[in-house]
Amino acid sequence: MAGGAVVSTGAGKDYPGKLTLFVFFTCVVAATGGLIFGYDIGISGGVTSMDPFLRKFFPEVYRKKQMADKNNQYCKYDNQLLQTFTSSLYLAALVSSFFAATVTRVLGRKWSMFAGGLTFLIGAALNGAAENVAMLIVGRILLGVGVGFANQSVPVYLSEMAPARLRGMLNIGFQLMITIGILAAELINYGTAKIKAGWGWRVSLALAAVPAAIITLGSLFLPDTPNSLIDRGHPEAAERMLRRIRGSDVDVSEEYADLVAASEESKLVQHPWRNILRRKYRAQLTMAICIPFFQQLTGINVIMFYAPVLFDTLGFKSDASLMSAVITGLVNVFATLVSIFTVDRLGRRKLFLQGGAQMVVCQVVVGTLIAVKFGTSGIGDIPKGYAAVVVLFICMYVAGFAWSWGPLGWLVPSEIFPLEIRPAGQSINVSVNMLFTFVIAQAFLTMLCHMKFGLFYFFAGWVVIMTVFIALFLPETKNVPIEEMVLVWKSHWFWRRFIGDHDVHVGANHVSNNKLQP
């Protein structure tokens, strides 16, 4: 066993719990669901910057790219069909996340992961064999269904398996796997772009099957969470599983009783989608909408989706564009590791606020550097030393995101919902995230063409707004068991007005005295 820890909640209860090897390895396997999301984020920008890919599927963009030295650098990739290739995945993920909520609740978290991995695997095969744009788009839609299922189930699974004190660290494993997937994709793009025969893009797209196979096979060996087992009518199995994941020498009776109470209460809710609109859940609903909305308006996916395209737009050569994307991918991974080891010590709020401030400064600097060299005309070139400074500040921006809004944008929504609305809440979180990921992916190249360097100021302004929002409206949630989170909202200066005294409860003694309205 790994080192044990008593979970001090700060909210009135202490659940004893250890980080057992069993929990560690199950969380690692589950977190690999992030690989498929990360691989896709990293692969699309590199592939769309490859000339053989553009010649075959997007010849108009290829012609504009060849003439870019004499024309506006900002606009050479502006093409709605090219943007649809990237963005269609996220629209599919948005829709599928609602179906995933039902699968996650009725069949369990692991089968939702399995469905996501299998669908992604089929989509990867179709994309690798694509002969026309229609095949590409259909493949992307299947990839999106896989991402929707994985993103809906993995964060919930990790939050339910982890001891409260270590929930942040283990949950951020999902974001770490996303960053590893991005980095792997960028390295693969760098290698496949050198294939002289021109079919390197097929290798890049087809290798998405590797992370898909990992989560598909891995999910078959995952146990169900105690929360899911209780909710699906297997209380004895749930108690055995809770004892196994907390440690055989740990008294889990109090935590088990509270999980049973939460499940009994959740079963009184016949319409969770309607129930989540109730006044007492206003705080959770607001966070489930605002946090993923703000996460996308940090502008991070401008860098992650289109890094090679962006660097090529700034005048980098093809090799340099792909290598600069690899550098940002490395920064992304290492900064996420920083978050893993600090989130349960420093807390969620401090990381959100520090990361926000860092991103604002870097975006303003990058926008200014681009403005000085390209102005509004988009005509110019960028010296090597100047380019290095641009890459440096982009890397600092990526680091700020990677230890704040990147992991916390998934962690915080996954840990704030009570069981009775958890699948519905996580589906809202994923669908909002995918909706605005779709919007950014579909609109970015057009926005870059029209807003030019001002696009970076646009995103910086949004980061200021979201940082103020966090400072005012998000309470600290570290070390608090999920079933006790209501105490955190009740003590907050703003959200307490939405929560009546009869809504504040912790533990098994509550259910018999409180009947939820459907």
From Swiss-Prot:
GO terms for molecular function: monosaccharide transmembrane transporter activity; symporter activity. It is a multi-pass membrane protein. It comes from the Eukaryota. Signal peptide: none annotated. Pfam families: Sugar_tr. Highly expressed in roots. Expressed in xylem and sclerenchyma cells of roots. Expressed at low levels in leaves. PROSITE patterns: MFS, SUGAR_TRANSPORT_1, SUGAR_TRANSPORT_2. This is Sugar transport protein MST3. GO terms for cellular component: membrane. Belongs to the major facilitator superfamily. Sugar transporter (TC 2.A.1.1) family. The keyword Transport applies. The keyword Membrane applies. Residues 1-18, 102-117, 162-167, 224-290, 344-351, 409-427, 474-518 are cytoplasmic. The gene is MST3. The chain crosses the membrane at residues 19-39, 81-101, 118-138, 141-161, 168-188, 203-223, 291-311, 323-343, 352-372, 388-408, 428-448, 453-473. Keywords: Membrane, Sugar transport, Symport, Transmembrane, Transmembrane helix, Transport. PANTHER family: SOLUTE CARRIER FAMILY 2, FACILITATED GLUCOSE TRANSPORTER, SUGAR TRANSPORT PROTEIN 1. It is found in: Membrane. Residues 40-80, 139-140, 189-202, 312-322, 373-387, 449-452 are extracellular.
